Every structure is written in structure tokens, then in C-alpha cells.
Design a protein with these regions (language model features):
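Flexible, gly/pro- and Lys/Arg-enriched active-site loops
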Residues: 1, 51-61, 72-150
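Nucleotide and nucleotide-moiety/phosphate-recognizing core
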Residues: 3-15, 19-93, 109-110
Length: 150
């Protein structure tokens, strides 16, 4: 019996970070997501190194994309992702600040949500190379893609 069939929502998240050993943090996040019964990981993108935007006086970011399945509703999924950000040391000091781990919900099934706490699809996804390029590479690499540094 395929556990994917039990999870009804397909979700694409963007991950990014520029504090500490970002690659190691991403690897640990992926292990946590794989162990978490609320999620089934489907595919990950290659990583992309990007310059910061907004606040420019900081290190470049590593970014990637993860596609997974879940039964959580969008708000519960958001809370779960925020808990993972906190687990890996995310501090919210100011907008576009350096961070250990940033998790953005890019798409949640084909839902459109616009609330104070949650906007899906992510409002800036189409303007961000940090989303577009890994998404294209993930889609071109087939099902066996692994999150890896370029």
C-alpha cells in the first residue's frame, strides 16, 4: 500500500539560508521531514547560490526547492514549517535579515490563499531566481533528484 496515496495535498516549499553551515542544516531538515509521518518527500532540487535581496549587507544564500505531500491543512502546514525554522535557529530580527533557515510555501496544491498570515501561491515566487531556477532544474531531473550543492 503506497503511503503517498494517504496524503492528499501536493506542496512545494522553498528553503534558503545564509548563516552557519547551510548545506548541513538543509540535510538535517530533509532528514527531519523524512522521519515526520505528516510528510512524504517526493523530490528535491539542486541547490543554487544567490545574492541577497532587500537587505544587501549580508552573505549570499543557498536556496532549494522541495516537493512533498501532506494531509495537513495550509495553516497547520505553515505552523509545522515555522517550528522547523525555529528548531534550526531562525531568528526574525527584521525583514530580509540573515537567517539559518527560511522555509517559504511556494504552492499548496492549486489553492489560492490570501490572509494576514499566509499567502499562497507565494507572492514573489515568479520574480525570484532562487525559486524559478531550482524549480526548473528539479522538473528537468526526474524523480530521483537529490538536494545537492552546485
Amino acid at each position: 500500500f503506497n503511503s503517498n496515496s494517504l496524503k492528499k495535498y501536493s506542496v512545494i516549499i522553498g528553503i534558503g539560508g545564509n548563516i552557519g553551515n547551510t548545506k548541513k542544516i538543509f540535510d538535517k531538515l530533509i532528514l527531519c521531514l523524512k522521519k515526520d509521518s505528516r510528510f512524504t518527500l517526493l523530490i528535491t532540487s539542486p541547490l543554487l547560490k544567490n545574492p541577497p535581496f532587500g537587505f544587501l549587507e549580508q552573505s549570499d544564500f543557498l536556496n532549494g526547492i522541495i516537493r512533498l505531500k501532506t494531509n495537513l491543512c495550509p495553516n497547520s502546514f505553515l505552523k509545522a514549517m515555522q517550528r522547523y525554522e525555529n528548531k534550526f535557529g531562525r531568528k526574525r530580527s527584521f525583514q530580509d535579515a540573515p537567517r539559518t533557515l527560511d522555509i517559504d510555501i511556494i504552492f499548496f496544491e492549486n489553492k489560492k490563499i490570501n490572509t494576514k498570515n499566509l499567502i499562497i501561491p507565494h507572492k514573489n515566487w515568479a520574480n525570484r531566481e532562487s525559486v524559478i531556477i531550482p524549480l526548473k532544474r528539479m522538473n528537468n531531473n526526474g524523480k530521483k533528484s537529490k538536494l545537492k550543492c552546485m
